[in-house]
Amino acid sequence: SNSSAASDVYKRQLYDNGRVNTSNIDVYHRPVDNSDPFQTDILVLSGKGEDEFMARFNYKGFRYVEVTSTNPLVLNENNLTAYFVHSDVPQKGMIHTSNALINRLWWATNNAYLSNLMGYPTDCPQREKNGWTGDGHFAIETALYNYDGITVYEKWLADHRDEQQPNGVLPDIIPTGGWGYGTDNGLDWTSTIALIPWNIYMFYGDHKLLADCYENIKRYVDYVDRTSPTGLTSWGRGDWVPVKSHSSKELTSSVYFYVDTKILANAAKMFNKTEDYKYYSALANKIKNAINDKFLNRETGIYGSGVQTEQSVPLQWGIVPEELKRKVARNLAKQVEAAGFHLDVGVLGAKAILNALSENGEAETAYKLAAQDTYPSWGCWIANGATTLLENWDLNATRDISDNHMMFGEIGGWFYKGLGGIFPDPENPGFKHILLRPNFPSGLNELEARYQSPYGEICSKWERKKNRIVYHVTVPANSTATFYAPDNVKGERAVNLEAGKHILELPIKRAVY
């Protein structure tokens, strides 16, 4: 006939015979019949010369497109055009280093983030396209260092307020058609209600979202307080898709309970809610003490069984007593060294591990982990051709095998923090005052981190020159900064910097073995 039907199937992997591999989607897809195949466009050609078609009412995540036709067609790559679509968020940050793997990893992380930003943050652009709460807050710092996304998150938190039940419970996908209330929709995922408004406040100095969500955070914390009167809770999904070691869900969920309660107490103080401030400050201390009493061995500096996630999460979120931080971090570094500078974490550990190391005197180990290119690591994906982040550390896994996922995406924010050292100051948020805590790991010779703050561009740039680090800093107008020197350089430990450009020459301490 004159008109033939062609179908385009959009997929992420190929079988050995060159056909598209749909297993990543088929494992979850439950079609009623074959009339509306998933990630597939069906078009009837006119038979009157060249036809043009663009799918305007959906989007797909894919690496390969397979075209099949009822009648023979002559096609080449010029007949198909792919458009990269995502929410319109201006770029705010830039990372460039002397390590090509790090540069490409930063780029791939941003690709994954944008692929998963379609009105709200999603888990993956091909299989579910759902607003998984955990994925959203694991990546929030990466998001805000790289992109001006405040309006996306204001909208998403309005969805949170709409979806919250009267008792305080949130579903673990938002928005939802009703699924996600009776699952493991606990603290390690649905803490978005507190973590995202707090991070918006840190990065923008704007507390409106925190104010809008105050009663919702309170209802959420009160629900957990009622159901977990000891301060310990196992409500959550746990360290999802770990390499091999499993962590205590009670430890990690209780840490997020602490974080939410601490954010609520800080917000209460800010909004002059004196009674709330007293109550939730006391509750936060109770939770912290309960965690340390149950899980911390104060003699050895080990949490739980001492696996990477159990050591990392308490360090990242301020649970570890001040006098034990270095000891706990050293134990974590030993674990990483014993694993050959490889990861043994799931999503909760991936969020915490680099920060836990680099902010507690173990930046060398953090950098070796970030720059690792063999399994299991972030860099292993890149070394094997990935242009986004994956859902599974194992390239040969048979489930949880999306090739475009954001849940392991904290590393993109860590480059600004652990290497560039650009941090907002909780006392003067929105980068009115900037905390500069860069690290100069021996394996890296140059780093440049730029971030467009509300006051102008912050630049933290350093290069290694023989026995010293030359550190260039730009502090924007109407801002100030404090530079904190890392352990491996000589000189003043803290230097206050006014607006303008500064060059600091920092002699490197000789390593003692």
Identify the meaning behind each predicted range.
Residues 133, 187-190, 207, 251, ...:
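Alpha-solenoid helical-repeat scaffolds
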Residues 14-33, 150-246, 374-395:
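Helix-terminus loop motifs that line ligand-binding clefts
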Residues 1-127, 134-135, 151-154, 171-178, ...:
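Extracellular/oxidizing-compartment recognition motifs
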Residues 364-513:
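Non-catalytic C-terminal accessory modules of carbohydrate-active enzymes
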Residues 4, 60-62, 72, 262, ...:
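A generic structural motif
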Residues 94-96, 110-112, 125-140, 144-147, ...:
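Catalytic cores of carbohydrate-active enzymes
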Residues 184, 304-305, 403-406:
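Short Gly/Pro-enriched turn/cap motifs at secondary-structure boundaries
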